[in-house]
Amino acid sequence: MDKLKHTLFGLEFKNPVWTASGTFSYGLEVAKIYDLSLLGAIVVKGLSLKPRKGNMPERIVETPAGMLNSIGLQNPGVDYFINETLPKLKKYDTKIFANVFGEDEDEYLAVAERLDKADGVHGLELNVSCPNVKKGGIAFGTDPEVLYNLVYKMKKITKKPLLVKLSPNVSNILDTADACVSAGADGLVLINTLLGVAIDVEREKPILSTITGGLSGPAMLPIAVRMIWQVYQKYGSRIPIIGVGGISNYKDALQHILAGASAIQVGTANFYDPLSPLKIIEDLKNHLDKKGYVHYSQLIGKAHQMIIKEV
């Protein structure tokens, strides 16, 4: 029996190790380094209706235990992805999820409609950390009512699995998780980046051109694990969770899984070690063998059970 092979959303995955949207671009760059078919899934860089140039420099700054980025969702547009990139990407035997974003509901729905018809796209990941221009710039993912309406309408558009990548920039992650579950989301991705600011003390001004940026990297690990814990504690296996945030090695991945994640995504680690997803896959197998587990699913949410046993 393959200890990592599993089924989620009606799809069969080789393993629970995915690449996160953004740091892996569209996968083809990394295909020069290793066979993408070894991965559980690839989540491609965010796609909008029209091409976007992104933000002006500076767009990235290193921070203790991570980095801040304000790329501005630079991408060639959904049509270019479908016509030019996807035909090359779908040659690999792995699952492909498209990250979707928009400046308003209409753009989200238009992008989803195109991707729903695209052969080779197995599912959609909804990026709700974007500012809603029709609601004064408030991010979709911070308003449960707005989020519910968006997810509900997206589910009417697509028959493919719809995952919602939740923002940690909220007072209570359960409020937005509840909205997504009620609206019919097939899964939750926890979590997106946390807003931060870095200041150049010599120039006495913010480093990033946009002032704020999204914090990612090892610093995010305990925050992501905490939010996965909260959502799993409420929903258990009723809603699959994909964990992302601070994963650099198999022990980090195990923290996500033990807290309740059914699969994990590797993000920032791809920058400094492109082979990190493959190392995590191999190390997870070795860990399961060493511990005598038949399948990795035995570990999903197990940390919750251990607390009950100890009490």
Swiss-Prot record:
**Which cofactors does this gene product need?**
FMN
Tell me the active site: 130 (nucleophile)
Name any Gene Ontology BP term.
'de novo' pyrimidine nucleobase biosynthetic process
Cystine pairings recorded for this chain: none
Query: Do you know which CDD domains this protein is assigned to?
Result: DHOD_1B_like
The EC number(s) given in the record are 1.3.98.1
Record-linked Pfam families: DHO_dh (PF01180)
Function in brief: Catalyzes the conversion of dihydroorotate to orotate with fumarate as the electron acceptor.
**Record-given protein name:** Putative dihydroorotate dehydrogenase A (fumarate)
Organism source for this protein?
Sulfurihydrogenibium sp. (strain YO3AOP1)
Underlying gene: pyrD
